[in-house]
A protein has these predicted regions:
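Glycine-rich loop at the start of a catalytic domain that most often binds anionic cofactors/ligands
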Residues: 64-79
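Short, hydrophobic/aliphatic alpha-helical segments
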Residues: 35-54, 125-139, 186-189, 267-274
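Accessory "access/gating" subregions that flank catalytic or transport cores
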Residues: 221, 225-304
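N- or domain-start disorder-to-order transition segments that initiate the globular core
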Residues: 1-51
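C-terminal catalytic subdomain
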Residues: 283-367
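Short, charged/polar, low-complexity loop and linker segments
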Residues: 199-207, 267-276, 338-346
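Active-site cavity-forming subdomains of large catalytic enzyme subunits
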Residues: 87, 91-95, 99-224
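Conserved phosphate/anionic-ligand binding catalytic regions in large, soluble enzymes, centered on
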Residues: 54-68, 137-160, 198-204, 208-219, ...
């Protein structure tokens, strides 16, 4: 069995690829990360006292209810209701590999310590990941500015709420049953800010993008071999290579960011301050996904030209579908949350299109 530690700073695409490929791999929280989380969690507990200042997301409502103060004695009960209004979704479920990877990525985000959650929560998430209990998450319903809907559905499985569902050993089950069969506690009590800290980020988008990119890397050598002529690649491939390298850098960086709002920063004289900087945004991944979809359309053109015979018709069909994925998504923006979230980048849609386009490119390469 291979054991990997996450610390919020060093989770790379290559590491995710190794963990995903190794069915016996296990992931744990590093001691250093655990200590950081305990320090910031102590500050959250202090803000739950009656004479504490008003801190968004800790003792207030969310979104356009940001100015509504929630008394400490009501907060735990209110906290339990948070996933429900956000966990709306439509469409088929995302692939289990996506939601599993989102658990790993979210645990790494929280391990940085800036969100103020207990280490026990991160350990709970990792135990679910290690047991391969994949939350059932609808594929429609996120703008990419914080994957609130998809991540709220993750939260419901982590907490073991009655309405949640999950995949376990190929079967779709109520989450509590899946957790029990995996040898885990059926429920887990989420404390102050721990629902928000799990929902408030674009981690489902990141998971889709990461898995699609890893799959693309698996196809890359085959694409190069098909496109080469006399050992030389076409000139346009160098431009593709630039975008591929840029995207890998973006995804590696985004694996290890503090994707939450607010974040806790240590003060020079001790204690922490809560900083509201909308760090739930994922604009850069949306841009990278749009560029990669353009790259795939270009590569698919080349693969199509190398395909002959009876397969030509199938190749044209696949090429057309890949090209439709190259239509830009992240240039759009429609305000949400009563106008409180006034810029959304739809990176979730861009990442899903990339995931699909990679799948189509694999089929085209196989012709």
């Amino acid at each position: 069995m291979s054991l990997y530690y996450i610390d919020g700073n060093s989770l790379t695409l290559d590491m995710i690829g190794r963990i995903t490929a190794d069915k016996e791999a296990r992931v744990a929280l590093s001691e250093e990360a655990s200590a950081r989380c305990r320090a910031t969690r102590a500050q959250i507990d202090r803000w739950m006292e009656k004479d504490a200042p008003v801190v968004y997301g800790v003792n207030t409502g969310l979104g356009n209810l940001k100015d509504v103060v929630v008394p400490p004695e009501k907060h735990i009960e209110w906290n339990k209701t948070l996933p429900y209004p956000h966990a709306a979704g439509m469409g088929e479920y995302l692939p289990p590999e996506v939601t599993l990877t989102s658990l790993l990525l979210r645990a790494n985000v929280l391990a940085r310590g800036y969100s103020g959650v207990r280490p026990e929560l991160i350990e709970r998430i990792l135990s679910i990941y290690n047991a391969k209990v994949a939350p059932a998450v609808h594929s429609e319903g996120s703008t990419g500015l914080s994957d609130l809907g998809p991540l709220a559905q993750n939260v419901m499985t982590v907490a073991g709420l009655d309405e949640a569902k999950a995949y376990y050993r190929g079967n779709l089950l109520p989450s509590r049953e899946a957790l029990r069969l995996a040898g885990l506690a059926e429920s887990f009590t989420l404390e102050c800010k721990e629902v928000l800290a799990q929902m408030n980020g674009s981690t489902m988008t990141q998971a889709i993008a990461v898995l699609a990119f890893l799959r693309f890397e698996e196809l890359a050598s085959g694409i190069e071999a098909r496109l080469s002529s006399g050992g030389e690649l076409p000139e346009f491939y160098e431009g593709c290579r630039e975008v591929i390298g840029f995207t890998k850098g973006v995804l590696n960086r985004e694996n290890n960011i503090s994707c939450d709002n607010p974040l806790l920063f240590e003060l020079p004289k001790g204690g922490y301050e809560a900083v509201m900087g909308c760090n739930c945004s994922n604009t850069q991944v949306g841009y990278a996904m749009d560029m990669m979809n353009t790259v795939l359309a270009e590569l698919a053109n080349g693969l199509h030209e190398k395909t002959g015979g009876l397969a030509k018709s199938e190749a044209r069909h696949l090429l057309n579908k890949i090209k439709t994925c190259a239509m830009q998504v992240s240039a759009d923006s429609i305000p949400t949350k009563g106008g409180q979230e006034d810029h959304v980048e739809f990176s979730f849609t861009a990442a899903r299109k990339f995931y699909y386009a990679v799948e189509l490119t694999g089929k085209l390469l196989a012709l």
